[in-house]
Design a protein with these regions (language model features):
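Alpha-helical cap/lid subdomain in secreted, periplasmic
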Residues: 6-9, 32-139
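Catalytic nucleophile-elbow at a beta strand-turn-alpha helix junction centered on a G-D-S/GDSL motif
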Residues: 10-27, 61-65
Length: 139
């Protein structure tokens, strides 16, 4: 995917998650959220045209766990198959704290993404609570 970016080929970078992806705590949230800042950093570092050929999709909804992420992946990211992202950054770890499936839904979401015909790259983002705890080991 990095070579695709460097070559100036059309590339789609998508972010799927909860309130952290939505931009909670960032002011203004649309410009200062981690998703936008990450997209801009990737474009600046890896593209010859500062991202003119890179599509940005942000699908963050506060309070949602990965169970809803599976549905939102189809609806908000791939738009029911019309879009094939090349990179998807997934952040649900905070909202999956009460996950009764012990990570099976999270795994199902990642498997669904990996099963796409274009085999997108996936980054799993695990936010850390103030006490340095996160769900990485549970998922």
């Amino acid at each position: 995917m990095l070579q695709q970016l460097r070559d100036g080929k059309p590339t789609t970078i998508a972010f799927l998650g909860g309130s952290i992806t939505q931009g909670a705590g960032a002011v203004p949230s649309q410009e200062m959220c981690y998703a936008r800042k990450t997209y801009e950093a990737i474009c600046e570092r890896y593209t010859p045209d500062h991202g003119a050929h890179v599509r940005y999709i942000k699908a963050g909804v506060g309070g949602t766990p990965c169970q809803l992420g599976i549905i939102r992946y189809d609806r908000d990211i791939t738009r029911d198959g019309a879009v094939q992202p090349d990179l998807i950054i997934v952040e649900f770890a905070v909202n999956d704290e009460a996950d009764e499936t012990k990570g099976l839904m999270h795994e199902s979401l990642i498997q669904k993404i990996w099963s796409a015909p274009n085999e997108p790259a996936v980054v799993m983002l695990f936010s850390v609570f103030a006490n340095d705890w996160n769900l990485k080991d549970r998922l």
